[in-house]
Design a protein with these regions (language model features):
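Conserved acidic carboxylate
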Residues: 9
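Two-component/phosphorelay signaling modules centered on CheY-like receiver
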Residues: 12-30
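Alpha4 helix (beta4-alpha4-beta5 surface) of REC/receiver domains from two-component response regulators
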Residues: 16-19, 63, 86-107, 111-115, ...
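As written
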Residues: 25, 47, 61, 70, ...
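Residue-level signal for the "D+5" position in two-component response regulator receiver
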Residues: 31, 56-59, 88, 96
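Acidic catalytic/metal-coordinating carboxylates
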Residues: 34-37, 60-66
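Active-site beta3 strand of CheY-like receiver
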Residues: 45-51, 56
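The feature encodes the CheY-like receiver
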Residues: 57, 66, 75, 87
């Protein structure tokens, strides 16, 4: 069975682009449009990986990541945070929240993703 990914992204355009990349490397993807929906989905059906946008309505990606990392169901699920920002401050906040990796959206590509997924043990 293909590894499962929960993508938490509020932009439908971005979600489609990212989903296409993830599916192109053989992953099964479900999409949540905001933080509360993403948390609910992750707790009900823990995925193999969570790809999480930082800028979300109602609660930001850092808050979502912290909640997921505190829950028994998802504490060991790798989280890759996505953002338009590339500053050190944002990276440190994301890692402190529990993210396993941090990828700027402008370099989100299949090759980089494959490398990260192998490092996290999601793909062989």
């Amino acid at each position: 069975m293909a590894p499962t990914v929960l993508l938490i992204e509020d932009s439908q355009t971005q979600a489609k682009q990212i989903r296409d990349v993830l599916e192109s490397v053989g992953l099964t993807v479900s999409v949540a449009n905001d933080g509360p929906e993403g948390i609910r989905e992750a707790l009900e059906n823990p995925p193999d990986l969570i790809v999480l946008d930082i800028k979300l309505p109602s609660m930001d990606g850092y808050q979502v990541c912290r909640r997921l990392k505190r829950a028994d169901e998802t504490k060991d699920v790798p989280v890759i945070m996505l953002t338009d920002k590339t500053g050190t401050k944002e990276t440190m906040i994301g890692l402190k929240a529990g993210a396993d990796d941090y990828i700027p959206k402008d370099i989100f590509a299949a090759e980089h993703l494959m490398e990260t997924l192998r490092e996290l043990g999601v793909l062989d």
